[in-house]
């Protein structure tokens, strides 16, 4: 019996999160693919075709026995200095890094690979303001108003709690 209540509570929580929470961040696969943190990718070209916002995530896929990912300052990035890094992102070869602030970020691969072009510089922008809702002038009304759908979901979840 208690299991039913637990599932109902989980269901209600998930529904509320889906309704209320709006995810604004994106995942960027560095280099454009699954395992593209390697010396065959032009990271400057890739970054120039991306737009990064605070809250976004970078995904680095690579062979961890050969490569690593170090967050560095601009000077270390330009000179490929890997012993004065800010943060070592390397964990398991499929690693993520969240871009928390709007600012420039610099990443390099140590072990001599930075000199072969394995480095990435990006500029992170502040989150854009939410877009204004589009004002549609329609003569028809939806069959089910959005608030009715939300109410139906919550009523169903509440009834499930009572069962």
Swiss-Prot record:
Positions annotated as glycosylated: 42, 63, 73, 88, 135
GO cellular component: plasma membrane; side of membrane
Keywords per UniProt: Cell membrane, Disulfide bond, Glycoprotein, GPI-anchor, Lipoprotein, Membrane, Signal
Signal peptide bounds: 1-25
Domain called Phytocyanin: residue spans: 26-126
MF (Gene Ontology): electron transfer activity
Chief localization: membrane
PROSITE patterns: PHYTOCYANIN
Domain of life (superkingdom): Eukaryota
Residues with a covalently attached lipid (GPI-anchor amidated serine): 138
Pfam families per record: Cu_bind_like
Coiled coil: none
Protein name: Early nodulin-like protein 20
